From Swiss-Prot:
Source taxonomy: Eukaryota, Viridiplantae, Streptophyta, Embryophyta, Tracheophyta
InterPro entries for this protein: H1/H5, Histone_H1/H5_H15, WH-like_DNA-bd_sf, WH_DNA-bd_sf
Annotated spans, Disordered: 1-50, 114-202
Gene Ontology biological process terms in this record: chromosome condensation; negative regulation of DNA recombination; nucleosome assembly
Induction cue: By abscisic acid (ABA) and drought stress.
Source species, domain of life: Eukaryota
Localization per Swiss-Prot or TrEMBL: Nucleus; Chromosome
Residue intervals of the H15 domain: 48-118
Species per Swiss-Prot/TrEMBL record: Solanum pennellii (Tomato)
Name of the molecule in the record: Histone H1
Length: 202
């Protein structure tokens, strides 16, 4: 019950202002979404085997079949020789390489077999010859420069050693010869004059 003259305070409902809305939304915006972890690319294995065409050529020359060698025979030879170096899917890559080489004229396709063409034989020989030449030149050059440098050092050292002791010996000999010659002359001149003076006085 309320007293007379007292009025009940009606409950005031506050409407949310724009400032309060911003405050409510602010903490939500502060939270940064977690960036997805970037997947590190798997490091590709270093290729240790020689180029496919070179391996194909080696297989065809080793098999030496007149009608050409089949892809299976080439793959078997490559697997026996480069087993640890070849990838798991090397047979698929070999099939593509055989087709591409035949299209370029490096290989001759006879039914289901492949044979080396003259162009394919020449290409590999020129590549190997050009690769070997720069290595030989690079090895020879530093040896010649080292030999000239050592020869120049050897020639310089004896010249300096011979030049220094010569003037000392010559100077010492000249001084020794000149001093006794001057000392002997006055003694020989004075001795006969003194004897003559004594004789005249007597």
């Amino acid at each position: 019950m309320t007293a007379i003259g007292e009025v009940e305070n009606p409950t005031v409902v506050q409407r949310p202002t724009e400032a309060s809305k911003v405050k409510e939304q602010a903490p939500a915006t502060d939270k940064k979404p977690r960036a997805p972890k970037e997947k590190k690319p798997k490091s590709a294995k270093a290729v240790t085997h020689p180029p496919y065409f070179q391996m194909i050529k080696e297989a065809l020359l080793a098999l030496n079949e007149k009608g050409g060698s089949s892809p299976y025979a080439v793959a078997k030879y490559m697997e026996d020789k480069h087993k640890d170096e070849l990838p798991a899917n090397f047979r698929k890559i070999l099939g593509l390489q055989l087709k591409n080489s035949a299209a370029k004229g490096k290989l001759i396709k006879i039914k289901a077999s492949y044979k080396l063409s003259e162009a394919g034989k020449k290409e590999t020989t020129t590549k190997t010859s050009t690769k070997k030449l720069p290595k030989a030149d690079s090895k020879k050059k530093p040896r010649s420069t080292r030999a000239t440098a050592t020869a120049a050092k050897k020639t310089e050292v004896p010249k300096k050693a011979k030049a220094t002791p010569k003037p000392k010996k010559v100077g010492a000999k000249r001084t020794r010869k000149s001093t006794p010659a001057k000392a002997k002359q006055p003694k020989s001149i004075k001795s006969p004059a003194a004897k003559r003076a004594k004789k005249i006085a007597v």
